[in-house]
Amino acid sequence: MSPFLPGIRPALTAALLAFAGAAASQAEVGLASTRGVTDPFRHVQALQDIATANGGNRAAGTSGYDRSADYVADQLRGAGYQVRLEEFTFPYSEERSPPALVLGPAGPDPFATPREALRSLSNSGSGDVTAPLRSVDLGLAESLQPGSTSGCEREDFTGFAAGEIALVRRGTCPFQAKVENAQAAGAVGVIIMNQGIEGQTDVFTGRLSTPAAIPVLSVTTEMGRRLAAAAQSATPATVRVKVDVETGARSTRNVIADRGGTGGAYVVVGGHLDSVPEGPGMNDNASGSAAVLEAALRLAREPATAMPIRFAFWGAEERGLIGSRHHVGALPEDERRRIALYINLDMVGSPNFARFIHVIEENKTDLAAATVQALKGYFDERSLATEERTGYRRGFGSDDASFAAAGVPTIGLFTGASGAKNAAQAERFGGTAEKPFDPCYHQACDTTGNVDPLVLGQITDALTEVLRRLPPPPSGR
């Protein structure tokens, strides 16, 4: 935790909490862009146009990402910012041929899995193995309940025989943990079935944070159930799993722009600019990039903020938070310790949205707490509901995790991913209960039509207002 933060307390609390309690005019209530400023959705459309012209995605290491970084850098330079491009390399894997999953002829119901029902995970190992199938703590009787822990603990693999293929269920822990536990038990392959709750039944895109030594596939809930039944049958089930991937290293870059010097305390505001290879990534995460970019452009037209701000657009988040990890790891120790707060924007235009404000409780400081209150106050003044989440881990991670791991206080603004909105949230935020916040998460349909311009505008306005009211850093820093 940054050692200077206690010295900020008096000015900080007064400045931010005064903002949180400010009165709102009736003309502002419920509007997306209340100050007559430009619409952040224009940046979403520009990034969609880039994806369309570059193979349908903006994945790190592709021309779509490079053109996206050029667009953001050009916008910032046009507003007067000095832009820094932070180059780094990242490991990648690409399929050389389609994956395959076949239930062997010795099983009770032989079949070959249709191509549309399976995918290889990013950073899967290559391999073509035929071996007995073993289900691991699937808990299918509780399939309507979120929170499967299948494969999350090494104890789940008690009785697992080396040389078998593990069938696990998507759930609460990272894919990496499931695969590492399976490898430790001697598995020669892993099949991850979708969880089976609303919004998590189809085949899904996933990534491993480090490359696996064995092939790893994802399959639909329906296909997983068929495999589970075969694994439990009287006749031993044998499956063939094939993944053929090319691995290597590619280069990409972060886009960084500072407003004010960073010789003292400063705030970092960021969102990832890359998409998954499967689609253009408009909600995930052109929306967050658009909010950060629009806030930077608006503030460039105003007097300097009291607290210096670094605006960051991360590359290779979808490959394992690599851009933000590179940035944090490359900072001199003194500069890293002077980061007073990191604010992350990831997926802030979900069509069936909620307005989530996340904070990691153990890293919470006066500045983080006051900023959360300022954001909640902004929305409260406009009769716009929010939901605060503490201990936020976003399951499989966003770039705030890179900063939190380095002891930096973090806040995340988020409107929901593939999980289902519950009835209480539908009552508070509108939308449809038991349906995903984002039905196109990590899919080709994550286009501009998958972004709600209203909530994107609301998030952008709130972010801009909080940034312009940040207190000055303590003197002598």
Task: Identify the meaning behind each predicted range.
Residues E28-S63, F88, D274, M347, ...:
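N-terminal capping segment at the start of a domain
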Residues T113, T262-G264, P277, A304, ...:
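Metal-dependent peptidase/peptidase-like ectodomains
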Residues A420-R477:
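His/Asp/Glu-rich mid-to-C-terminal helical/loop segments that flank catalytic regions of hydrolases
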